[in-house]
Amino acid sequence: MTAPTWIEAVVREFGKAAGLSGLALNDRGAAAISFENGAALRLEYAFDSLVAALTLPARLDPATAARLLAYAHPEARYGFKLRAGYLSKGGRAVFAARLADREVTLPALNSVFSVLWRIGQEFGGAS
């Protein structure tokens, strides 16, 4: 799905601020960045929302599952709803946030990324 021009501009500005001048949504409304530590950030525009998802290498065991659930608990306060899960194919934890198109601003995207990255550090993958 093609994103509105102004959302594409926010993503480009986010990339420039992060030193990734080539970051832009493709014709499907998606962009991805892989980091040296194995973490990956994916941005995707669909259904009038921009989703930011950070994935990290992880093994699934009861302790990991409990930690994933704790991060996504309704009482956790991040300023947005956080979803957490596990991708068995590839063995990756995933943390995601959805911003409605009217909420997509450079400060909001920076805030979401900062929280996702901090959670990744706490979880043990992003550094």
What residues fall within each predicted segment?
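Short beta-strand-to-loop capping motifs
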Residues: 35, 54-56, 97-101
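Short, internal acidic amphipathic alpha-helical interface segments
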Residues: 51-90
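Well-ordered alpha/beta subsegment
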Residues: 81-114, 118-127
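Generic alpha-helical secondary structure
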Residues: 4-7, 61-65, 109
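Charge-rich, low-complexity N-terminal segments
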Residues: 1-40, 77-87
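Short, well-structured hydrophobic secondary-structure segments
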Residues: 33-36, 41-54
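Short, Φ-rich (hydrophobic/aromatic) sequence segments
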Residues: 14, 64-72, 110-116
